[in-house]
Amino acid sequence: MEVNRLAYLTAMGSLRPPSPNGDWSKPQDAPHKSVIDMMASGVSHIKVLKVDIDAQHLCVCLPHNMLTCCHPAVDMENLLGSGSFGKVYASGPGICAKVFTSAEAFYHETVMMDLVALARSYNCDDFKSVCLQFYLSACVTCKTIWYPRFSQSLHTFKDFTVDHLHDLDREFKGLTDAVFFLNQKCGLFHGDICPSNILVETFKGPGSGIKSLILTDLGTAAIHAGNTFKSLSINNPQDDSVIYNAQIYLSPFLVCKDYVKPLCVLRRCYLLRHHAQDVDVEEITDTVVGQNMALKIDCSTLLQVLLLVLARVMEQPNSLTYESWLREIEDDSSDAYFLLLLGPKLVLLTHLSQLWEINFDVGVNTQGVLSRGQLPHPHTRLLKECCQLFREEFDAVVKEEVLIKLGQGVLKNIIFELLQFDYFEIHGRQPQHGLFAQSHAARADSEHGNWRTS
């Protein structure tokens, strides 16, 4: 029994494709030719030193221009921001410099950004990368990468109004294209899409609209399993010694910020914690994520960011009720923690269902009832109570003018598109999971047992 439980936890913690004979079935990774594959037969920004077909591994070296300090000066007196791996300073006109405290973090982000640059060069006619950040240069000696400069991100941009809805509709379609480009043409899984990692460019003038949203920060991006070559290292061309292995350890707990974790990842985390007993499930990690799973998680996380931003638009100024609920939940060591994160997301989706007179099926409803299977009774009651409490607070701060605008269908298509990926099951939405509940089913917030199968 103990062996079976450990096998279950290990399988639940892994995001890689299952073995052909395994029980964890899901759609196979789609064949494509990504930038990782193309690097094996050409020389570009990063030069290929050695190809190990059996190990599915590439050895590369950095180009000469990254090894010399021929770049704009960094204004160390003008700090723009800071993060886990370094700080961002002003540099030349219109650019900024990200100075890393860790050589490993610098190498990783440099390689990921150069792969994106390579993909762009190989796909000149593909404009899906317009909303994906590009880098200007990098210096190994200074452990610094130069980027175009933006004044704010979705995390710091708080002055949303109903007039921004059309901008959000347009730009999140562009961000969705960027995720597809990253997945299909770059062979990468972002894994950390959040408001802080989406930059904002506004039109000039007070109360101006959003000109563009840009997906950035590949500091924890990973090479997904859809590539022919699934790992990569930076080697010294003189003696072939390994300088850095571009490898990220993945688990459902490490993927995405908790407050924007999609439903499929919340489900995995919940099950891992629920069945853990004395096993440290956070130590169960893997180094490969399947291509389809990578796309599902990134698109589903993008949906959660959109819902969070939409909640800012819907709420009275300075309320941030939706965001506060998600950020202030305590005791992340329990399985119930992941159900409490689920509550506000379900309530907001229910609001949209009612506005558009459509019954979304996301695998669970605000009554704590699953489309397939069931939660333990105490957890059903907990999720139901969480949804009720949040709805009471949220309804009190929602602006009527926004509901009217949303009722006209703004954001409807992009939310439908992103909902195609997420579902409260470990592999996300699959072909048998319809986007909408059956026409005769009860509303998502009604008192009903199983609104999808009853």
Curated annotation (Swiss-Prot):
Keywords (A to Z) from UniProt: ATP-binding, Kinase, Nucleotide-binding, Transferase, Tyrosine-protein kinase
Entry keyword Kinase: yes
Endpoints of the signal sequence: none
EC number(s) on file: 2.7.10.2
PROSITE patterns reported for this sequence: PROTEIN_KINASE_TYR
Top-rank EC class of the record's enzyme: transferase
InterPro entries for the chain: Kinase-like_dom_sf, Tyr_kinase_AS
Catalyzed reaction equations: L-tyrosyl-[protein] + ATP = O-phospho-L-tyrosyl-[protein] + ADP + H(+)
Positions contributing to ATP binding: 80-88, 98
Molecular-function GO term, any one: non-membrane spanning protein tyrosine kinase activity
Catalytic residues, chain numbering: 192 (proton acceptor)
Superkingdom, natural source: Viruses
Protein family per UniProt: Belongs to the protein kinase superfamily. Tyr protein kinase family.
Protein name: Putative tyrosine kinase 36
Gene that specifies this protein: 36
